[in-house]
Design a protein with these regions (language model features):
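N-terminal periplasmic "start-of-domain" segments of outer-membrane beta-barrel proteins
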Residues: 26-55, 82
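N-terminal periplasmic accessory domains that precede
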Residues: 60-63, 81-84, 96, 110-116, ...
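Transmembrane beta-barrel wall of Gram-negative outer-membrane proteins
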Residues: 167-192, 204-259, 282-294, 344-352, ...
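Short acidic/polar hinge/loop motifs at secondary-structure boundaries
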Residues: 100-128, 459
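Flexible loop and strand-edge segments within Gram-negative outer membrane beta-barrel domains
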Residues: 197, 226-232, 245-299, 307-334
Length: 637
């Protein structure tokens, strides 16, 4: 369960060899200018530095929950958190970090609770067809995360400690050094908590008995979250070198060590001392980059490596004080990454790009608790290698200042199978400079191959699965108005529609386990709304408001599998039809009052959309309120 209250007390010490920084109020200014050629027709949400850094203890799952229209499925802090666009599933969301894809090749998804916002300097969401500009497989969209040079001058040290309720501690450290050519940064985050908060358990009822042991009343018990502790360590090393002659070199290395208990169910009547339910992970990600930049062209290359080791252990007391291993799942992933790209401008009207990337995965998954067969092979598990190749070329044309068009051609290979050509066409135009009213539209094909677990997981994997494929259409209107140092107002409204064939879904079998199959043709459509308002009320008082709303039906339009199949024409399970967020920020001098609210409509747990007590999840609301005051300490010179 999500923690209901988290109070953060931060002590920040900053040491610098340079002159003292000053905290200044930044007033919003609407800047009107030509749209970047790279972004012709692209529908994206860029998260600014305020959203990324306003609460240093946030993971990227928390940031996206309150600052975007996408669906974030989370079970609370330090628990699995996934994101999905436009009524699709988390495996339809492609995620990259400094250009390298970080989707788990076994599951196809990314755990955003494992990404501290403290480690991210730039984040953007590419909605729907716009993801084809970056990669294939993003039937819903893509999330781009990256770091950038610290822009330090000399040595710098930043240390922040967060102390929260339920013995929660967060430690943040950053060391920086910079000059005209070098930028070096080391960041570290350590978070820990027993996470044993109290809550009213409405999934249980305790009986009240009279002296004759007759039930005379019932009540909901107040319990503590059991078996929910966590210890997470993250270290990020960055080195950047700029020759000053158009060449830039970069190194990014990120290490994760996580040890998390998995909380007991709210309907579990056992004691937390009777079992141990734990997930551990060690991950290393490294990216080397080179950029060669000239006035009208650029070439770049990247190479990277990812290693992930994950363990899941489940132990129970047999009743005699001896803990028995029920499950000992182990998996390891090694991924080699390479990418080359180029850009060429012809005047200010044409931009041509080409990109080729490769990810080679080596995956081993097994359960060490399974009795070994002859030859030492486990009954449950697999060992597979799969290459993933993606290449694209594009031409972007801006015949006039107001009009832009873009054509992208992409093709991908997974294993030995190639996708059909993936075309995407984008167009945008300024309808009126008064109000900066712009329109965008796009259309694209897209494909996604099954994950390794979809194909080979034992028991249940289906090696005969087909790839998912379909066409998507987008259209949007946006505006931006404002008066310098007074106010700014911007907003957008977009419509989208996707037709996906051979949708993959895991379903129960008569053999007692789940198995994936291509059973559904899905029609996903809807609208997304977004608005931002910033007002300088006085020289010292400032108000900021942000709101989003999404309506995202995802309907099964396939044929019934059996006469009893009631899923046709129904919303897909676990996909909310509506979601919304509101953020309000009121600042005065060094004080900031912040209110955040998010909402997800009810979700069905059955493909038939059964409305019984167990057939749906109730609507979800969450509010966060915080009051902050920054207290600068005199720098040590």
């Amino acid at each position: 369960m999500r923690r209901l209250c988290y109070i953060l007390i931060a002590l920040c010490l900053t040491f610098s060899a340079m002159a003292e920084e000053r905290t200044v109020a930044i007033r919003e200014i609407t800047v009107l200018g030509q749209r970047p050629m790279k972004e012709i027709g692209v529908q994206q949400t860029k998260l600014d530095s305020v959203a990324l850094k306003e609460n240093i203890s946030f993971s990227m799952a928390d940031v996206l929950t309150f600052n975007s229209s996408i669906f974030v499925k989370s079970y609370g802090r330090a628990t699995l958190s996934t994101v999905a666009f436009r009524g699709t599933s988390p495996s339809h969301t492609q995620v990259s970090w400094n250009g390298m894809k970080i989707n788990n090749p076994m599951l196809g998804m990314t755990d955003f609770s494992m990404i501290p916002s403290y480690f991210i300097d730039d984040a953007s969401l590419l909605h729907g067809t716009s993801s084809v500009n970056e990669t294939g497989g993003g039937l819903g969209g893509a999330v781009k995360l990256s770091t950038k040079p610290a822009d330090a001058d000399g040595f710098g040290v930043q240390y922040i400690q967060g102390i929260g309720s339920f013995k929660s501690f967060d430690e943040f450290l950053r060391l920086t050094y910079g000059n005209d050519h070098w930028q070096i940064s080391t960041r570290a985050v350590y978070s820990s908590s027993p996470n044993d908060y109290k809550f009213l358990n409405r999934d249980k009822k305790e009986n009240v008995y009279d002296e004759n042991m007759n039930i005379i009343d019932q009540y909901y018990p107040v319990e503590r979250n059991r078996s929910g502790s966590y210890k997470d360590l993250h270290i990020l090393q960055e080195v950047y070198y700029n020759t000053g002659k158009g060449d830039r070199l970069g190194l990014n290395a990120w290490y994760i060590n996580s040890n998390r208990e998995l909380a007991m169910l709210t309907v579990d009547h056992g004691s937390d001392t009777d079992f141990d339910n734990r997930q551990r992970e060690q991950t290393f990600r490294g990216v080397l980059s080179w950029d060669h930049i000239r006035r009208n062209w650029k070439v770049a290359a990247k190479g990277g490596y990812t290693y992930t080791w994950m363990a899941y252990d489940y132990k129970r007391d047999l009743g005699n004080g001896v803990m028995a291993h029920m499950t000992r799942s182990r998996s390891s992933i090694n991924t080699i990454y390479g990418q080359a790209e180029g850009e060429y401008y012809i005047g200010n009207k044409w931009l041509f790009t080409a990109n080729l990337s490769m990810h080679q995965h080596f995956v081993e998954s097994r359960d060490k608790n399974i009795v070994l067969q002859q030859g030492g092979n486990g009954i449950l598990g697999y060992r597979k290698a799969r290459p993933e190749l993606s290449g694209s070329v594009s031409a972007k044309w801006r015949p006039t200042e107001r009009l832009g068009m873009s054509l992208v051609i992409r093709e991908e290979m997974f294993g030995r199978e190639w996708t059909p050509i993936i075309p995407a066409f984008f167009i945008d135009g300024v309808l009126s400079k008064r109000g900066n009213i712009a329109a965008k539209a796009s259309v694209s094909r897209n494909c996604r191959f099954p994950t390794l677990n979809d194909l080979y997981f034992l028991p249940g994997g289906n090696p005969d699965l087909k790839k998912e494929s379909g066409w998507s259409y987008d259209a949007a209107l946006s505006f931006a108005v404002g008066k310098q140092n007074v106010y700014s107002l911007s907003g957008s409204a977009s419509w989208f529609e996707s037709f996906i064939k051979d949708w993959i879904i895991w379903l129960p079998t008569t053999k007692g386990f789940f198995s994936p199959d291509n059973i559904k043709d899905v029609h996903a459509y809807g609208v997304e709304l977004q608005v931002d308002l910033n007002v300088a009320l006085t020289k010292e008082w400032q108000l900021g408001l942000n709101g989003t709303f999404s309506w995202t039906p995802s309907i099964n339009v396939g044929e019934p599998r059996t006469p009893a199949d009631k899923s046709v024409g129904k919303q897909l399970p676990y996909v909310p039809e509506r979601s919304s967020t509101i953020t309000g920020r009121l600042s005065w001098r060094r004080w900031v009052f912040l209110y955040k609210w998010c909402y997800y409509s009810e979700r069905y747990t059955m493909s038939s959309n059964d409305i019984s007590l167990s057939g749906k999840l109730p609507p979800y609301f969450m509010s966060n309120i915080s009051l902050e005051k920054s207290i600068p300490l005199k720098h040590i010179e």
